[in-house]
Curated annotation (Swiss-Prot):
The keyword Endoplasmic reticulum does not apply. It comes from Syntrophomonas wolfei subsp. wolfei (strain DSM 2245B / Goettingen). It catalyses: (S)-dihydroorotate + NAD(+) = orotate + NADH + H(+). The keyword Cell cycle does not apply. Heterotetramer of 2 PyrK and 2 PyrD type B subunits. Pathway: Pyrimidine metabolism; UMP biosynthesis via de novo pathway; orotate from (S)-dihydroorotate (NAD(+) route): step 1/1. Keywords: Cytoplasm, Flavoprotein, FMN, NAD, Oxidoreductase, Pyrimidine biosynthesis. It is found in: Cytoplasm. One of its GO terms (biological process) is 'de novo' pyrimidine nucleobase biosynthetic process. GO terms for cellular component: cytoplasm. Catalyzes the conversion of dihydroorotate to orotate with NAD(+) as electron acceptor. Gene3D superfamilies: Aldolase class I. This is Dihydroorotate dehydrogenase B (NAD(+)), catalytic subunit. Binds 1 FMN per subunit.
Length: 302
């Protein structure tokens, strides 16, 4: 049985990754799961300089998921490269870095710092950040800005570049086409949906940041629809995620058009989910007579 996939030039031993922001740097979970056995660990979002993150509360549980407004708390790219990457390299973890910038120039600079670093397999771009130079509009909501960010990063690195698409748009295909035009090697989708909650006793928003990102099973139908749409129109491999909590969910994503899947919120519930889910995928493939995971990709379009 062949579980290997090629995600835009990144060779994965299996098609199950863990999503950025839900698995730390991979090392935090090492008491529960061997991170090197996961297809890829997409590490915590990294910025050029250290960031303290948003004021609390930062997380709020919803009936079918959770809202988070962490605010990209992280020690900065230099600390990641100096302290975390060598330990991941020792364990032979397939690492995909995740970077977030305040400007196109910052994305390009971080890409240049990652270029040539042994142990980095690719770069995921968090483009759900406000563009400080353009009045705070999110990079990922404007097709031309998406194209510019991807193109600027591609100029600075030979690593595969994977923009993570925001679902908070009216036309996801237009955004995906712009990313492809900028030179993206693959697409990661989807990021969180914007949301909020209100405490009726305090009569104010629950989250310190007021707004947050909704993740978990609630967003799965949205993710599936968007992946299905993009698969039909854009010739790039897709890393699909959004509400995957079991192997049945993952299989739906493959059939919609995802080459690989990423587990996010589910990691908080079950740290071993990625590998348990992989076993479920294998069992399904055996029962259904599939010899390669690639046979499942996009099969719902046939």
């Amino acid at each position: 049985m062949d579980l290997t996939v090629n995600l835009g030039g990144i060779k994965l031993k299996n098609p199950v990754a863990v999503a950025s922001g839900t698995f730390g740097y991979g090392l935090e979970y090492a008491d529960f799961i061997e991170p090197e056995k996961i297809g890829a660990v997409i590490v915590k979002g990294t910025t050029l300089h250290p960031r303290p993150g948003n004021p609390g509360p930062r997380i709020y549980e919803t009936p079918a998921g959770m809202l988070n407004a962490i605010g990209l708390e992280n020690p900065g790219i230099e600390v990641f490269l100096r302290e975390y990457l060598p330990r991941l390299r020792e364990r032979q973890v397939t690492v995909i870095a995740n970077i977030a910038g305040n400007s196109i120039e910052e994305y390009a600079l971080m890409a240049s710092l990652l270029q040539g670093q042994e142990g980095i397999a690719g770069i995921e771009l968090n483009i759900s950040c406000p563009n400080v130079k353009q009045g705070g509009i999110q990079f990922g909501t404007d097709p031309e800005t998406v194209r510019q960010v991807v193109a600027a990063v591609k100029k600075e690195t030979s690593l595969p570049v994977i923009p993570k698409l925001s679902p908070n748009v009216t036309d996801i295909v237009a955004i995906a086409l712009a990313a492809a035009d900028g030179g993206a090697d693959a697409l990661s989708m989807i990021n969180t949906l914007g949301g909020m909650a209100i405490n009726i006793n305090l009569k104010k928003p629950v989250l310190g940041n007021i707004f947050g990102g909704l993740s978990g099973p609630a967003i799965k139908p949205v993710a599936l629809k968007m992946i299905y749409q993009v698969y039909r129109e854009v010739d790039l491999p897709i890393l699909g995620g959004g509400g995957i909590v079991n192997h049945i969910d993952a299989l739906e994503f493959f059939m919609a058009g995802a080459t690989a899947v990423s587990i996010g919120t589910g990691n908080f519930v079950n740290p071993c989910l990625a590998l348990e889910l992989l076993e479920g995928i294998k069992k399904y493939m055996q029962e259904q007579g599939f010899s390669s995971i690639q046979e499942l990709v996009g099969i719902a379009h046939a």
